[in-house]
A protein has these predicted regions:
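Classical Sec-dependent N-terminal signal peptides that target proteins to the secretory pathway
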Residues: 2-19
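Active-site catalytic motif of lipid deacylating hydrolases and related acyltransferases
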Residues: 17-124
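C-terminal catalytic-base region of ester-bond hydrolases, centering on the histidine
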Residues: 24, 172-240
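Serine-dependent carboxylesterase/thioesterase catalytic core
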Residues: 64, 91-99, 103-195
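Alpha-helical and His/Cys-centered functional microenvironments
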Residues: 72, 135, 232
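Glycine-rich, phosphate-binding/catalytic loops in enzymes
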Residues: 81-84, 145-146, 170-173, 203-205
Length: 240
């Protein structure tokens, strides 16, 4: 990827492939001996919208929503979802058309969150984790956030600064403030180690947001170069 155009086109605007013959996946399926690649295919085969990954439990106090990036193959989410899951969290995976702009998926996600909160008054916290382009989607939720339930957002390897193509095609503007009862964590890969970003003129992760909590990831993770996709697993281990 030699230019901003190819970066945006290849990462954000290529439609994913799916196999409709595969059944809907649940976190309980992660315990099987199925390969991570195959589990990832099933994850990305989920229908657009907010997908519950497990049965609801009486003790649940938090809804935890994962939002994939552009052209994701899903495999990068398998370990993190299993690691983050607890009895107090109800895990969801948000599938959205990442080959398009983010505005409509943001509105749909907010509507679905509102519906859950209206149905279950025991929920005390909303957590979202967005990777790459998905990080832009989850931060845009904060622009008009007016719900009383506290919200915690984690963005990983996400180009929150924007790119010329994203700005012009989707009228992207980064958030300028973090609302009350909300927390934003930024988990940034090292520019030169991230194959998605390293050929750009500047690091699109580097944005100044007052009150945001920023962590730069290390060089390696379990003996692997800590680049774009491994970043989710590192955050799952360190933040949860």
């Amino acid at each position: 990827m030699k230019s901003i155009f190819s970066f945006f086109l290849l990462i954000f605007l290529l439609p994913g492939c799916s196999d409709t013959s595969l059944p809907p996946i649940k976190i309980s399926d992660f315990e099987n001996d199925t390969s991570v690649k195959n589990l990832g295919m099933r994850l990305m085969d989920l229908p657009y919208g907010l997908n519950s990954m497990e049965p609801s439990l009486a003790e649940v106090q938090e809804i935890f929503i994962s939002v994939h990036g552009g052209n994701s193959e899903g495999y990068e989410w398998i370990y993190p979802l299993k690691k983050i899951n607890t009895k107090l969290r109800h895990m969801y995976f948000y599938r959205w058309p990442d080959n398009s702009c983010f505005q409509n998926p943001v509105k749909k996600l907010k509507d679905e969150i509102t519906s859950i909160l209206n149905q279950d008054k025991s929920i005390k916290k909303i957590s979202l984790i967005g990777h790459s382009y998905g990080g832009i989607l989850v931060t845009q939720l904060l622009k008009d956030w007016n719900l009383s339930t506290p919200i915690e957002i984690h963005v990983i390897a996400s180009p929150l600064l924007g790119t010329p193509m994203l700005n012009s095609m989707c009228a992207y503007e980064p958030i300028s403030a973090i609302p009350k009862k909300s927390v934003l964590y930024e988990w940034r890969t090292q520019f030169q180690l991230d194959n998605v970003f390293k050929n750009l003129n500047e690091d699109p992760q580097r944005i100044e947001l007052n009150g945001s909590l920023v962590t730069t990831l290390p060089d390696t993770y379990k003996g692997n170069r800590l680049g774009h996709n491994w970043s989710i697993s590192w955050v799952a281990d360190e933040a949860f």
